[in-house]
């Protein structure tokens, strides 16, 4: 099972305040633990929403909104993508994580859909296309 672990943004992360050297060392050690355990697939920190944009869809219309975005608690400041055997294991990995922000912070855990989750609508042709695209994307990495 794959899970996305999303570090929620804070006022500090949205202000562009970078982590301390100590925090970078702690996160580096945690990431090394994840990699050595064979569970980490990806992980990155994100720039503040002031450097981002959103595209709103309404039928065929597209509206672009530049950041920053107001609801800091709903924003993501970073993420990991991990592969583990259960949600409980994902929770245990998150509990071992150093606090990613000074003060209070939150990491949201969400399971990633797998091919079998889509049922009969996910035809053999669509599966083949997905596998081909994943292989091409891996080559691009």
Task: Show the residue positions of the predicted features.
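Conserved, structured core segments of small domains
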Residues: 1-141
